[in-house]
């Protein structure tokens, strides 16, 4: 996928916004550039779906939002986390509160390394994932990454009562 972007860098600018699973990536950029990209993808018979989003998330076009976030986050007093946190920027464990602040800012312009994050967690002993909130998108992505892990979704109060850990 990156090769396709590199080959066409003079025709349009698009960045990988999400690496969700093998065969599923999300690209981000200006609408006009994404339209050109869609044309290229269709000509190569590569399946694509234009997502209805309000901004070019997780790419360099979010620079202004990054600066706003930087100013706001620096005002906050974070505490060290008692639980392990995995950054979607690095797909690795966040080591301390200062790194957490930096990564929360960086994630605005950088791609989400979902697939790598899930692999990191599995390789470090996580074998049960619980998705909280409407839908099952993340659960589906996790199952595409590794069918052997246990997954649950919690959408209702009864889902909580039925949850078996």
Model-derived features: positions:
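Acyltransferase
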Residues: 1-144, 152, 158-165
